[in-house]
């Protein structure tokens, strides 16, 4: 088994900074105020070629109420999952009562625990860590995570001895970030191969929406465990959380994202960075579930987020949450509003669910698989050209400057989303209405559902364009005689 290392401690002691340092990413949000990390987050790290899984957790200080209580529960769950615990303290702040409470809990769990004193830059390390020996956790490892000082020594003295006793593991099945990056790279490489099998890869599924529409509740309902902090306050998820799972024999990487709100309401840099990571999660996903609050209806921000999903070319499933408890009259009004405002998204399935009670959730994955299969289906050049020919026979292209636009052949230009490349003459002059006609014709003929389809046009090149033949001496003499004759008859 690959070792699992949990970073625990009070809020704002530098756990996320060390997490980013170990995983060589910026996957954990970092800012100078307590309570920023709310869920436990997994990342892949290695030392001297040996891999381990690092878990970043929310802080525990013993004064939690509301959502902070749930953050503390996530931290305690991370301790149970871990093989090794790095207990981090703040050397600048000194020993705090919360540090003593955490140390007491760690001793009761009998987990291998190592005490790490962070923020020792500018201090005498030996003097700064003296008070922490009273915690009774043995040797103290002073580091400055923000600058990387002492981190390598920590790895060599703490983690490497543990990993030398473990055989390298070839398959990592719990590290979601590893899955996401590895499969994205593998997807990009294998798409160029004829024997590419999209069914062999996990489906990366992002759950997005405005704050407090029930994304994390839906994630937990799907997983069957309280994996993501859920609390009735907008913005309790600030990071994008990658979670591997399996359902009906198919593997998935579930991405629970931070809520995206109106730009004017994004008041601090942390939330702006969370929005960026949400948009990056959409780019990384194969299929996106857009969660909409049935009680609040379609907002401009929902449409803005929908536009980003479409521009990214991602497959889409629309989920209308909080459907329970609504009267039949209100439900009809919501459906009419959806038809009116989302009429241009005719390819996406719409599901009405209650994530809290689980009604309608079981049917979501049928649409997810349908959308993924549509976006990754391989179609040959002969089939695409035949469909294009049928479309032209049913409805001829318009005349452009007195000449009919000629479409010659079509072939696949990419997948996820499906791209059809059409070659012909004067295709750049085709009106948008005819391009939409072709797109809809291909969608109907290929039975593409849940995924956008894109059509690109390539103009046939004239090999003689901008070229002039040089005249032979005989042709030059004829040309001169002709020019004389023309001048003489003027």
From Swiss-Prot:
Changing residue 118 to D: Does not complement a disruption mutant at 42 degrees Celsius, diminished association with 50S ribosomal subunits. GTP 2 binds at residues 209-216, 256-260, 321-324. The keyword GTP-binding applies. Changing residue 414 to R: Does not complement rrmJ deletion, complements der disruption at 42 degrees Celsius. GTP 1 binds at residues 9-16, 56-60, 118-121. InterPro entries: G_ENGA, GTP-bd, GTPase_Der, KH_dom-like, KH_dom-like_a/b, P-loop_NTPase, Small_GTP-bd. Residues 3-166, 203-376 form the EngA-type G domain. Changing residue 16 to A: Does not complement a disruption mutant, KM for GTP 4.9 mM. Decreased GTPase activity, no stimulation by YihI. Keywords: GTP-binding, Nucleotide-binding, Repeat, Ribosome biogenesis. Signal peptide: none annotated. GO terms for biological process: ribosomal large subunit assembly. One of its GO terms (molecular function) is ribosomal large subunit binding. Residues 377-461 form the KH-like domain. Belongs to the TRAFAC class TrmE-Era-EngA-EngB-Septin-like GTPase superfamily. EngA (Der) GTPase family. NCBIfam families: GTPase_EngA, small_GTP. Associates with the 50S ribosomal subunit in the presence of GMPPNP, a non-hydrolysable GTP analog, and thus probably also in the presence of GTP, but not in the presence of GDP or in the absence of nucleotide. Interacts with YihI via the last 490 residues. This is GTPase Der. It comes from Escherichia coli (strain K12). The lineage of its organism: Bacteria, Pseudomonadati, Pseudomonadota, Gammaproteobacteria, Enterobacterales.
């Amino acid at each position: 088994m690959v070792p699992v290392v949990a970073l625990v401690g009070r809020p704002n002691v530098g756990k996320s900074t060390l997490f980013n340092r170990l995983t060589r990413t910026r996957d954990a949000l970092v800012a100078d105020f307590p309570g920023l990390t709310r869920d436990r987050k997994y990342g892949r790290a290695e030392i001297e070629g040996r891999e381990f899984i690092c878990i970043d957790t929310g802080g525990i200080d013993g004064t939690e109420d509301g959502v902070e209580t749930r953050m503390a529960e996530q931290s305690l769950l991370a301790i149970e999952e871990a093989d090794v615990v790095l207990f981090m303290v703040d050397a600048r702040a000194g020993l705090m009562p919360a540090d003593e409470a955490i140390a007491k809990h760690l001793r009761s769990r009998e987990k291998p625990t190592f005490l790490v004193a962070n923020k020792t830059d500018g201090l005498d390390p030996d003097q700064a860590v003296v008070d922490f020996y009273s915690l009774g956790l043995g040797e103290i490892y002073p580091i400055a995570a923000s600058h990387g000082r002492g981190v390598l020594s920590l790895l060599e003295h703490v983690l490497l001895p543990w990993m030398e006793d473990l055989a390298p593991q070839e398959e990592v099945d719990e590290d979601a970030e590893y899955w996401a990056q590895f499969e994205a790279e593998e997807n990009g490489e294998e798409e160029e191969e004829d024997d590419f099998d999209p069914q062999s890869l996990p489906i990366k599924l992002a759950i997005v929406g405005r704050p407090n529409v029930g994304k994390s509740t839906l994630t937990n309902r799907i997983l069957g465990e309280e994996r993501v902090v859920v609390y009735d306050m907008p913005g309790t998820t600030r990071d994008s959380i990658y979670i591997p799972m399996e359902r009906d024999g198919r593997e998935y990487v579930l991405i629970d994202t931070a809520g995206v709100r109106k730009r004017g309401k994004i008041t601090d840099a942390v939330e702006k960075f969370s929005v960026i990571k949400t948009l990056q999660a959409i780019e990384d996903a194969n299929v996106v579930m857009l969660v909409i609050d049935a009680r609040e209806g379609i907002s401009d921000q929902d449409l803005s987020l929908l536009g980003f999903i479409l521009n990214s070319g991602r497959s889409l499933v629309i989920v209308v949450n909080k459907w329970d408890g609504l009267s039949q009259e209100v439900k009809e009004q919501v459906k009419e509003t959806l038809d009116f405002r989302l009429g241009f998204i005719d390819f996406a399935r719409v599901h009405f669910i209650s994530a809290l009670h689980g009604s309608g959730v079981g049917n979501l994955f049928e649409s997810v698989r349908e959308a993924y299969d549509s976006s990754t289906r391989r179609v040959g050049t002969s089939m695409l050209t035949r469909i294009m020919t049928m479309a032209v026979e049913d409805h001829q292209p318009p005349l452009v400057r007195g000449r009919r636009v000629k479409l010659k052949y079509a072939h696949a230009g990419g997948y996820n989303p499906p791209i059809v490349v059409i070659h012909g003459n004067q295709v750049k002059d085709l009106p948008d209405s005819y391009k939409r006609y072709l797109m809809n014709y291909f969608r109907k003929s290929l039975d593409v559902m849940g995924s956008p389809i894109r059509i690109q046009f390539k103009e046939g090149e004239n090999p003689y364009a901008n070229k002039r033949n040089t005249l032979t001496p005989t042709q030059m003499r004829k040309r001169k005689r002709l020019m004389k004759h023309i001048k003489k008859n003027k």
